[in-house]
Amino acid sequence: MSEEKSVLRDLNLKNDDELMLRPQTLNQYIGQDDIKEMLSIYIQAALKREESLDHVLLYGAPGLGKTTLAQIIANELGVDIKITSGPAIEKTGDLVALLSSLSPGDVLFIDEIHRIPRFVEEVLYSAMEDYTLDIVLDKERDSRSIRIELPPFTLIGATTRFGDLSHPLRERFGAVFRLSYYKLEEIKQIVRRTSKVYQNEIDEKAVDELSKRSRGTPRIANRLFRRVRDFAEIMTDAVITLDITQLALTKLGIDHKGLDASDYLYLRGIVERFNGGPVGLESLASTIGEEPGTIEDVYEPYLLQEGYIKRTPRGRVATELAYNLLGVKYYKGLLDN
């Protein structure tokens, strides 16, 4: 994977800089206003009753702030948070160890919760409902079960694939929130905040340009800011101007719509190889040399949001907007194929 591509694609990587940029309270968190309002009410009510917060499920595209919100919830509750991910929980013992280590009121955050093995997931059910663990011990022909009492805790799950969660697991979350792409003005606020954290001056036209190319995603906005800052520090007096921003983003291969070479490869695959579609996910993935899961989680959410593609029962279809972007003549009725 190239350096340019990684700015937009490696959305699950986190580093110390990104941790430094994270807001610590709901008041500091920019965007997702409806979610913040509801969380504030739920948190205040839980604190007033001196109870643990109901379990929370956060879902949406990568980079929209699910992990940050989980940490903020713990901060607002004044409790500790333990962070893990679905792939790290391979067996029942892994989950039991995590749950047994919690103190009363603590938050357990599981990223990519849809990737927990189903047999492990089932152990969560009683833990979430009754704060108990029922463990079956097998000893040759005899088996017995033991019950472990757990302290009250809050489970926060995050996923990019809401539909992959089992119905029993979804039903055990008391609050479910879908994070949306951020509005342009919200991304601008995030860019201005980032410039203050890094103590880099940026002019307003540069803020606007960088924000427009950030795909409505805070993590991308912050990463693009750091790359543009590099150009500014080497080529000017470190002030981030419109010219420097345009130069840096062009070098990174990101166009004025926030699309990169991989997006164009995807769209050309549908339009040129499959006559605009419909095309199945596996066929498309094979054509462009990408994993199906990456296409679903990273490529498609933004292209769907912006109207370049549609998902139909028969597969992916390129829209007239995609044809116009690629400079290919569009014929009415293609979407009805």
Curated annotation (Swiss-Prot):
Q: Which domain of life is it from?
A: Bacteria
Gene Ontology BP term (one): DNA recombination
Q: Does the keyword Hydrolase apply?
A: yes
Specify which residues bind Mg(2+) according to the UniProt entry for this protein: 67
Catalyzed reaction equations: ATP + H2O = ADP + phosphate + H(+)
Extract the signal peptide range. Answer: none
* Chain segments carrying region Small ATPAse domain (RuvB-S): 183-253
Q: Which SUPFAM superfamilies does the record match to this protein?
A: P-loop containing nucleoside triphosphate hydrolases, Winged helix' DNA-binding domain
The record lists ATP as bound by 21-22, 63, 66-68, 129-131, 172, 182, 219
| Keyword entries, A-Z | ATP-binding, Cytoplasm, DNA damage, DNA recombination, DNA repair, DNA-binding, Hydrolase, Nucleotide-binding
Output the CDD domains linked to this UniProt entry. Answer: AAA
Where does it live in the cell? Cytoplasm
Transmembrane region(s)? none
Enzyme class (EC, first level): hydrolase
Q: Name one GO molecular function term.
A: four-way junction DNA binding
Q: Which GO terms describe its cellular component?
A: cytoplasm; Holliday junction resolvase complex
User: Which residues hold DNA?
Assistant: 311, 316
Spell out the residue ranges making up region: Large ATPase domain (RuvB-L). 1-182
NCBIfam families per the UniProt record, alphabetical = PRK00080.1, ruvB
Its biological purpose: The RuvA-RuvB-RuvC complex processes Holliday junction (HJ) DNA during genetic recombination and DNA repair, while the RuvA-RuvB complex plays an important role in the rescue of blocked DNA replication forks via replication fork reversal (RFR). RuvA specifically binds to HJ cruciform DNA, conferring on it an open structure. The RuvB hexamer acts as an ATP-dependent pump, pulling dsDNA into and through the RuvAB complex. RuvB forms 2 homohexamers on either side of HJ DNA bound by 1 or 2 RuvA tetramers; 4 subunits per hexamer contact DNA at a time.
Q: What is known of its domains?
A: Has 3 domains, the large (RuvB-L) and small ATPase (RuvB-S) domains and the C-terminal head (RuvB-H) domain. The head domain binds DNA, while the ATPase domains jointly bind ATP, ADP or are empty depending on the state of the subunit in the translocation cycle. During a single DNA translocation step the structure of each domain remains the same, but their relative positions change.
Family recorded in the similarity comment: Belongs to the RuvB family.
Spell out the subunit comment.
Homohexamer. Forms an RuvA(8)-RuvB(12)-Holliday junction (HJ) complex. HJ DNA is sandwiched between 2 RuvA tetramers; dsDNA enters through RuvA and exits via RuvB. An RuvB hexamer assembles on each DNA strand where it exits the tetramer. Each RuvB hexamer is contacted by two RuvA subunits (via domain III) on 2 adjacent RuvB subunits; this complex drives branch migration. In the full resolvosome a probable DNA-RuvA(4)-RuvB(12)-RuvC(2) complex forms which resolves the HJ.
Q: What is this protein called?
A: Holliday junction branch migration complex subunit RuvB
Name the species this protein comes from: Acholeplasma laidlawii (strain PG-8A)
